[in-house]
């Protein structure tokens, strides 16, 4: 099972679209993140897993592989959590995969499943606009910054 979602990375003072690809397969159960990732992004593995569990989602024991691209741009911070969670939910059939092509997601997940504010929202939202996304989902506390 495959799905994809989108977020944005900060590259200098600009943003760039981050493509979140998720594959669900047979194998040793677990969640693996791959890409050019900071430690905060690698820690998303646990934040997302626990946030989804505490939000009431249950999944069969499967191997979940998540690739964050482009590979040549370092992904920093916690703003990818929401997009990773959405991609997992889509891969398991909870969310329509087609609608995700129109949305860029920004936000950190708390262990309780709540969406937390993040830094650098404005250049990320502008990146969504520049790249033709119809919607950009941001944390409530970042709405004023998002414009």
PLM regions with names:
Residues 1-147:
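Peripheral, non-AAA+ core regions of ATP-driven protein-machinery
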